């Protein structure tokens, strides 16, 4: 797509008129120049840091706004989508009518008309047979920078054949004046129309809405083709052994998959088809709160020119204070995946997964650091998706909150959770993969399990040193827990040992078990769910 006149006509078709200069797939140097211009004000303007990366602020929206997520309910989505207003569920897919959509679209297209625009064409998905060709349209340079970092950058030759089958229009500066009359949550919106294949953004500057919006779309299209869509990081060893790490934001997906002894496939979103595991993205979106070079060298060294920092505190001398959470706990950096040295090249994909790791951050101090799951327990804990929401990843979350997130990514699911569990199970059985629950949360004394111990546990899983050690059964949860792991202090393996009295653990465990049981009631009316009840905790 090099014909600007054709591009102008296409923008007109979208409803965007009288466009000024178009920056089409701008280089990083042009983006750097445009996002740091002295004439920019407010959230548009980036600050150059000593590390070389540009830092931007996103205002009050330092995380996603799930209550402002809307899907047009029409003939395509009516019977397939997992709706917020149907059944016993916690879906974020709030339905809107075509009429409301039309008003939101007018709001965004008017905002994007009569001004210079940045247009970025990119791929979502490393496999050509299942990827989306996505066009991003924004008036803000750093938002174009963000998607250039996060999605797969087409070659010049691929751009000549690029025909978008999904469009994202980011009108962060506009808000919806009629939201009360329309019965919506607020003046801000992140809306999708699968018939028109468009995403609209208004009112929120948070970059992650573009990233996670496309993830929700991949989570719709792929499982319907029997391709697993997974909220996970993934890496591969020298022998071609693939491991995937499921987990919500802040549980360790990015950190634990950045392993100097293994090649990174990707840090957050993947598919699993007949050929193996593949990345949806071309970049990483890592949390930076309390980031240090010694603990996370790969991520630290990725923060350089072309990386984009979000909501970090930049000191007067341009130094970044990664320990300062005054803006948000959810400080972030996006960077192209090649900023990590040890990556799968030239395409972010590998073979079938052999190790499936569910990461959970247990704020109760009940679960052990690691458990080898049976096939039935794998399904139960995948559908439960227990973790704690960590500070700042969503608007209003300021301290750890115990929660259940189906498939470790409930906020991004477009279909019913059982459909993802079914496809994942099929892929696991075909590949003879094993699953483990790894707790990166807190013990009974309120101390978080150290990254050193967690890395040693992951190492033992990957090298199959955990499969043949003695185990004990943890009551209530009926989990098989190893008594020893090489490189790990054995005292931390039994969560009861971190309490002065076992009955303290017992009380907390019973409390948490009741939460598991109550949460799983939403699946008990299905044949699969009823069979899995015995694979969870019992009182």
From Swiss-Prot:
The keyword Membrane does not apply. It is found in: Cytoplasm. Substrate binds at residues 64, 206, 212, 332. Keywords: ATP-binding, Cytoplasm, Decarboxylase, Gluconeogenesis, Lyase, Manganese, Metal-binding, Nucleotide-binding. Its main location: cytoplasm. Binds 1 Mn(2+) ion per subunit. Its cofactor is Mn(2+). It catalyses: oxaloacetate + ATP = phosphoenolpyruvate + ADP + CO2. GO terms for cellular component: cytosol. Monomer. Belongs to the phosphoenolpyruvate carboxykinase (ATP) family. This is Phosphoenolpyruvate carboxykinase (ATP).
């Amino acid at each position: 797509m090099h014909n600007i006149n054709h591009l102008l006509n296409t923008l007109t078709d979208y409803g965007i008129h009288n466009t000024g200069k178009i920056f089409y797939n701008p280089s990083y140097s042009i983006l750097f120049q445009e996002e740091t211009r002295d004439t920019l004000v407010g959230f548009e303007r980036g600050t150059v840091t000593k590390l070389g990366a540009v830092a931007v602020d996103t205002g009050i929206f330092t995380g996603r706004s799930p209550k402002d997520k809307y899907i047009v309910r029409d003939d395509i989505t009516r019977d397939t989508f997992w709706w917020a207003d149907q059944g016993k569920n916690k879906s974020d897919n709030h339905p809107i009518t075509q009429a409301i959509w039309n008003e939101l679209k007018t709001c965004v297209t008017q905002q994007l008309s009569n001004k210079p625009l940045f247009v970025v064409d990119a791929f979502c998905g490393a496999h050509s047979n299942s990827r989306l060709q996505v066009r991003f349209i924004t008036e803000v340079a750093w938002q174009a920078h963000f998607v250039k970092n996060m999605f797969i950058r087409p070659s010049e030759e691929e751009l000549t054949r690029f025909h978008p089958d999904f469009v994202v229009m980011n009108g962060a500066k506009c808000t919806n004046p009629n939201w009360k009359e329309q019965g919506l949550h607020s003046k801000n919106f992140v809306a999708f129309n699968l018939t028109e294949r468009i995403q609209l953004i208004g009112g929120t500057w948070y970059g992650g809405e573009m990233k996670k919006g496309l993830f929700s779309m991949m989570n719709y299209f792929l499982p319907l083709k029997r391709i697993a869509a997974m909220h996970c990081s993934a890496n591969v060893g020298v022998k071609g052994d693939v491991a995937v790490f499921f987990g919500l934001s802040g549980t360790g997906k990015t950190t634990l998959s950045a392993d100097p002894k293994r090649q990174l496939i990707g840090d957050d979103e993947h598919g699993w088809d007949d050929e193996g595991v593949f990345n949806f993205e071309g970049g990483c979106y890592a949390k930076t709160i309390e980031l240090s070079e010694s603990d996370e060298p790969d991520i630290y060294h990725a923060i350089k020119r072309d990386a984009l920092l979000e909501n970090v505190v930049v000191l007067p001398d341009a130094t970044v204070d990664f320990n300062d959470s005054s803006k948000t706990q959810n400080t972030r950096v996006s960077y192209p995946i090649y900023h990590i040295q040890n990556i799968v090249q030239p395409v972010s994909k590998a073979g079938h997964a052999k190790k499936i790791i569910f990461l959970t951050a247990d704020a109760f101090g009940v679960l052990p650091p690691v458990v080898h799951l049976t096939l039935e327990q794998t399904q139960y804990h995948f559908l439960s998706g227990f973790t704690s929401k960590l500070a700042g990843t969503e608007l209003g979350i300021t301290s750890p909150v115990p929660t259940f997130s189906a498939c470790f990514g409930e906020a991004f699911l477009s279909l019913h959770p059982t459909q993802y569990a079914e496809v994942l199970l099929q892929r696991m059985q075909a590949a003879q993969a094993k699953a483990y629950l790894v707790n990166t949360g807190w013990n009974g004394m309120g101390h978080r399990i150290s990254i050193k111990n967690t890395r040693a546990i992951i190492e033992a899983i990957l090298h199959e040193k955990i499969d043949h050690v003695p185990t004990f059964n943890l009551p209530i949860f009926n989990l098989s827990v190893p008594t020893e792991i090489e490189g790990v202090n054995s005292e931390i393996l039994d969560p009861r040992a971190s309490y002065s009295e076992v009955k303290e653990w017992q009380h907390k465990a019973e409390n948490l078990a009741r939460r598991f049981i109550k949460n799983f009631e939403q699946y008990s009316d299905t044949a699969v769910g009823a069979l899995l009840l015995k694979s969870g905790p019992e009182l």
